[in-house]
Amino acid sequence: MTRVKVCGVTDETDLAAVDAAGADAVGAICDVPVDTPREIPRERARELFAAAPPFLTTTLVTMPDSVDHARDLAREVGPDVLQLHGDFAADDLDSLRATGVGVVPVVDATDLARARDLAPVVDAILVDTPSDSGAGGTGETHDWDASRDLVAAVDAPVILAGGLTPDNVVEAVRTVEPYGVDVASGVEASGGVKDHDAVRAFVAAAKTARGAVDDHEEVVA
């Protein structure tokens, strides 16, 4: 079954909605050099993660300028996982992971060499549509065929992000066959505010999409 992360949560009401919908992970955004209504202060992220139920994985999405910056964030906010935007070397990610926090770097779908280099030292790889600054969260899809090729080539779980919505997530899963999917703007009523009906619809579609893959393969066979 495809795992689901809902990202860019900013308050307890949306956190509860994500949990009630059956998502596997929730993300909050801190310390990013881009203008986004989803960014919240470290203290707020810490409060939200402390309020998360025990089986909902908390993910801090950030773009730190150094490994020390990332360590400080992990120590101060206390997430289960750090999702890192930026050009970090494999050795740096390995040392960060050794502190006990999960590490998920963001990689361009066309950069197979980097994905292969990082795969042995990270918990998963997230493929997103990058902005000019190198951050994700553009709300735009990318070449899913390239993402599918990356899934096949990399020995690590791959999480698909970028422009996903309740309307296209089944097709995305059927095409890419990722370990998980990640959504932010695709389930929002407005910037930084989740549409709870859309959250429920997205999670349900993503969770049943793997059956759609299996059914499709049987028809083709």
From Swiss-Prot:
Name the InterPro entries for this protein: Aldolase_TIM, PRAI_dom, RibuloseP-bd_barrel, TrpF_fam
Sorted alphabetically, the keyword list is: Amino-acid biosynthesis, Aromatic amino acid biosynthesis, Isomerase, Tryptophan biosynthesis
EC number(s) per UniProt? 5.3.1.24
**Superkingdom of origin:** Archaea
**S-S bridge residues:** none
- Which Gene3D superfamilies does this entry report, sorted A to Z? Aldolase class I
Q: Name one GO biological process term.
A: L-tryptophan biosynthetic process
Listed pathway(s): Amino-acid biosynthesis; L-tryptophan biosynthesis; L-tryptophan from chorismate: step 3/5
Which GO MF terms are attached to this record?
phosphoribosylanthranilate isomerase activity
- Reaction catalysed by this chain? N-(5-phospho-beta-D-ribosyl)anthranilate = 1-(2-carboxyphenylamino)-1-deoxy-D-ribulose 5-phosphate
Family statement drawn from the similarity comment of this UniProt entry: Belongs to the TrpF family.
Q: Which named protein is this?
A: N-(5'-phosphoribosyl)anthranilate isomerase
Taxonomic path = Archaea, Methanobacteriati, Methanobacteriota, Stenosarchaea group, Halobacteria
Gene name tied to this protein: trpF
